[in-house]
Amino acid sequence: MANRSRVLVTGGAGFIGRRVVRALLTEGHEVTVADLRAFPDPEVRTLVGDLCDPDVATRAVEPGTDVIIHLAAVTSVLASVQDPVATHLLNVDATARLLELCRENEVGTFLLASTNAVVGGGSAPDEVITERTVLRPLTPYGATKAAGEMLLGSYANCYGITGAALRFSNVYGPGMTEKDSFIPRLMRAARDGEGVQVRGDGSMLRDVVHVDDVVQGISAAWRGQHNGPLILGSGQSVTVNEMVTTARKVTGAPIPAENVPVGCGEMPAVVLDISAAKALGYRPAFDLETGMATVWPDFAPEGATP
């Protein structure tokens, strides 16, 4: 991703984090993971603990650290609605503590995993979301991520830290069997011979991006020393109905769909402008069908043909 560096990856044992850590190791960086659980490879140094604990955070950010990639967060909209206080503790308080440790230890770069949910209600059905779209989050998740972005911006402005707020769209890919977002729900439904619930009539537009494209985007932001928000998505919006149809094609399962009312915090549409990331060299490589085909083997019954 850049010259050999000492990198702290918070949330590095998670779905996105594991891919990020592997890429960093391949490029020869010295990596430390801070997470609630150990990294699957025991050779990777892991600090197991809760970053909401000041002692854990202090031990995580060692003198000599060059870069922090902060992926640890409450990432579920539903979980944030159910427990907004816990969401604030991790997404805001822990982020603020890491930024202060970044300042104290003279860490030069801080890459924050954010989300396009920070714009929330600012996205009308015909509006293309850019880095300049007004922040109008609809949920505690979006609000806490917006707060994290503002904290990062203030530290970049006051203390000279290079800080990028990477606004991921809906990330999918191999290794998400424990996730409860829509694509793994489709995969489980195909495996178990069940159906899925589709909120609304299924015509809402969504941008879904493959995890390997996200890793590429993180690298582009780091190499380019990007400051401020940066949208990382596929740049190709699809309807929820198209996602269901593609899952049927990839899995060979019927996956019946039941339409249910739209829930709290649903953005009316997600149509992203990724030109700023492209200017840094970002080139998303996966279309929806190709990407889903990389997810299905993790869920497929033994002997099934992906």
Report each predicted region and the residues it spans.
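N-terminal Rossmann NAD(P)H-binding glycine-rich loop of SDR-like oxidoreductase domains
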Residues: V7-E27
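NAD(P)-cofactor binding segment of oxidoreductase domains
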Residues: P63, Q82-F110
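Active-site helix of classical SDR
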Residues: T144-A147
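C-terminal substrate-binding subdomain of Rossmann-fold SDR/epimerase-dehydratase oxidoreductases
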Residues: A190-P306
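Flexible, glycine-rich beta-alpha linker
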Residues: V119-G120, T139-P140, A164-S181
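Conserved Rossmann-fold cofactor-binding substructure of NAD(P)-dependent oxidoreductases
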Residues: R45-V67
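Conserved Rossmann-fold NAD(P)-dependent oxidoreductase catalytic core, especially the SDR/UDP-sugar
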Residues: R97-P140
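Conserved beta-loop-beta element that borders a ligand/cofactor-binding pocket
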Residues: T115, E149-P174
